[in-house]
């Protein structure tokens, strides 16, 4: 490396829509179990765009410069002396949330609820849109030979979708309705199919997204009309032969109207899982939820076993993520890529690593 070449070029958010490329020190291993990863691909997530566009998400507020990105894959370039599961040169998917391992949620396996979570690109912690990133070996997952590094960058959103689908307890023979045909919603459709669902209906307000969903993993699609949630739910049930309703409803949109329609379209005794986040507070059809005695759950990120299952599904060929990647851009084009994702272009955009 020439003396004037950047050692750890990073894509840094300084304020709302104010970003820069900054050469930062190469991170050092802080623990004997740490590994240093040369990041090769990073997907742009809606949360990254929200921080860039608004400077905050709920209680997480940008107060100092932060490296963006958390959906990444890469190649191990250095390992700590206690690392046993990885070696230099291994291709890995990065799980970007490091838990404390000591609190009750961590010890119960629900480490996504860790009280001291350090999550990449969630203020104040830096993300993975840099040449190098350090994390513990057990949060790096070696990619099976059947998977490439682009697939690896999709393991983070797939982990989210796997967790949602496991929360919903989708089983063989189930009918599933998924609201939202963005990357996570589409992956919920794919995971539901892998888990044995026989009917999977994708719901979205963008026809082109529904066209993609039908080709990808959904058995049917539904475009809501400008009508009440009750009316759209009835159209959805009757139009797709759902009888009294779907066994499982997943909302991956966070839109209030989708939440309402989802509650109404679920069958009595069915399951409703909220995976999408929208406004902090919305109105809610509590009468319908109670009188149907719905099993209602929230879903947040991923926890024990979700990443491993995501890799197994893709590595074994039971689920494919390649179709979701609609564009790959150079690291130096990251800001333009954020603009395009905000405009709704494509399904999943990847930013190549600093080395290309």
From Swiss-Prot:
Known function: Xylitol dehydrogenase which catalyzes the conversion of xylitol to D-xylulose. Xylose is a major component of hemicelluloses such as xylan. Most fungi utilize D-xylose via three enzymatic reactions, xylose reductase (XR), xylitol dehydrogenase (XDH), and xylulokinase, to form xylulose 5-phosphate, which enters pentose phosphate pathway.
CDD domains listed in its UniProt record: sorbitol_DH
Organism lineage string: Eukaryota, Fungi, Dikarya, Ascomycota, Pezizomycotina
Family, per entry: Belongs to the zinc-containing alcohol dehydrogenase family.
GO molecular function, one term: L-iditol 2-dehydrogenase (NAD+) activity
Cofactor(s) the record lists: Zn(2+)
GO biological process: D-xylose metabolic process; L-arabinose catabolic process to xylulose 5-phosphate; sorbitol catabolic process
Keywords (A to Z) from UniProt: Carbohydrate metabolism, Metal-binding, NAD, Oxidoreductase, Xylose metabolism, Zinc
Protein name, entry field: Probable D-xylulose reductase A
EC number(s) per entry: 1.1.1.9
Top-level enzyme category: oxidoreductase
Protein's pathway: Carbohydrate degradation; L-arabinose degradation via L-arabinitol; D-xylulose 5-phosphate from L-arabinose (fungal route): step 4/5
Organism from which the protein derives: Arthroderma otae (strain ATCC MYA-4605 / CBS 113480) (Microsporum canis)
InterPro entries, alphabetized: ADH-like_C (IPR013149), ADH-like_N (IPR013154), ADH_Zn_CS (IPR002328), GroES-like_sf (IPR011032), NAD(P)-bd_dom_sf (IPR036291), PKS_ER (IPR020843), SDH-like (IPR045306)
């Amino acid at each position: 490396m020439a003396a004037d070449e950047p050692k750890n070029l990073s894509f840094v958010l300084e304020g709302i829509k104010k970003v820069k490329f900054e050469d930062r020190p190469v991170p050092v291993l802080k623990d004997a179990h740490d590994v240093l990863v040369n990041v090769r691909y990073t997907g742009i997530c809606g949360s990254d765009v929200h921080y860039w566009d608004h400077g905050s998400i709920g209680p997480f507020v940008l107060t100092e410069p932060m490296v963006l990105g958390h959906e990444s894959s890469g190649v191990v370039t250095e390992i700590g002396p206690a690392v046993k599961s990885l070696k230099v040169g291994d291709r890995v998917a990065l799980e970007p949330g490091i838990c404390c391992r000591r609190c009750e949620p961590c010890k119960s396996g629900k480490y996504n609820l860790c009280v001291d979570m350090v999550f990449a690109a969630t203020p104040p912690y830096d993300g993975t849109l840099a040449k190098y990133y350090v994390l513990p070996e057990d949060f790096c997952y070696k990619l099976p030979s059947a998977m490439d590094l682009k697939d690896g960058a999709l393991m983070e959103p797939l982990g989210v979708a796997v967790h949602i689908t496991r929360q919903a307890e989708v089983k063989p023979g189930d009918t599933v309705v998924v609201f939202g045909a963005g990357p996570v919603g589409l992956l919920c459709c794919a995971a539901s199919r892998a888990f044995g669902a026989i009917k999977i209906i994708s719901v979205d307000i963008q026809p082109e997204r529904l066209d993609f969903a039908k080709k990808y993993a959904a058995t049917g699609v539904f475009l809501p009309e400008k009508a009440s949630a009750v009316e759209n739910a009835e159209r959805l049930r009757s139009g797709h032969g759902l009888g009294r309703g779907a066994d499982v409803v997943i909302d991956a949109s966070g839109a209030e109207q989708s939440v309402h329609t989802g509650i109404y379209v679920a069958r009595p005794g069915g399951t409703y899982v909220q995976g999408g986040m929208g406004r902090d507070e919305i109105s809610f059809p509590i009468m319908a939820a109670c009188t149907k005695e719905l099993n209602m759950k929230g879903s947040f990120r991923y926890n024990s076993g979700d990443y491993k299952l995501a890799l197994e599904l893709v590595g074994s060929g039971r689920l494919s993520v390649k179709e979701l990647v609609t564009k790959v851009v150079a690291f130096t084009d990251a800001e333009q890529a954020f603009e395009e994702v905000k405009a709704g272009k494509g399904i999943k955009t990847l930013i190549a690593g600093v080395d290309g």
